[in-house]
Amino acid sequence: MVALTGESSTPIPDVDGVILTAPAVWGRPTMDLLPRLALWVGVRLMPGLTLTGRRLKIQPSDNIAMLRALAQDPMVIHATRIDTIYGLVNLMDAALASGARLDNPLFVMYGAKDEIIPREPIRRFVDTLPAEPSRRRKLAWYENGYHMLLRDLEGRVVIADVASWVLTPSAPLPSGADRTAGEAFLRAGSQVTVAGR
């Protein structure tokens, strides 16, 4: 997603398709005032302060064994500086704004139980996608999916859908997650149509 936003110094790659799993598009335009204000103040007054998500009571996956392993992994970042979070939000701003430029074949996946990226930013991102050609776009909504869709307990279902889309993008997904995606993703009056329905 970084390369596709144009924010990277890396040239935008010539790719056959783009797969976005729970895309990080929670940019400032979709945030409430309080988080935006807290980030603005924090990056100016305490940019080096580190924060953890321990007290947030957010569950990124239903795969508890995997989450416990990540908690013990020394290679996983467990505390993040405020200035790093600020940079991440800048990147999410760019990602949210990049939807209108994504004319590659696209597969967007999102879990109904995602507690990291709210549904509204995903809806806004999907709503900005080019209206045509809709046949090159597939949206998938996983009723039992969390943020870490590929590592969730039903991750094999998601992986099978990814494999199906890579091999035959126009075919319906084996899980059927594309059949309910339209109602879950799109706003009333959206110009975007959903392929595979």
Where are these regions (language model features)?
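Alpha/beta-hydrolase-fold enzymes
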Residues: 1-81
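Short, conserved loop/helix-junction motifs that constitute active-site signature segments
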Residues: 12-13, 99-103, 129-133
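Hydrophobic/aromatic beta-strand patches that form the interior of the parallel beta-sheet core
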Residues: 19, 107-109, 140
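Acidic catalytic loop of the alpha/beta-hydrolase fold
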Residues: 78, 113-117, 125, 148
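Active-site nucleophile elbow and catalytic-triad environment of alpha/beta-hydrolase enzymes
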Residues: 80-98
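Short beta-strand/loop motif that positions the catalytic acidic residue
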Residues: 102, 108-110, 114
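Short alpha-helix in the alpha/beta-hydrolase fold that links the catalytic acid
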Residues: 104, 118-128, 155
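Catalytic active-site module of serine/aspartate enzymes centered on a nucleophile-bearing elbow/loop
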Residues: 136-197
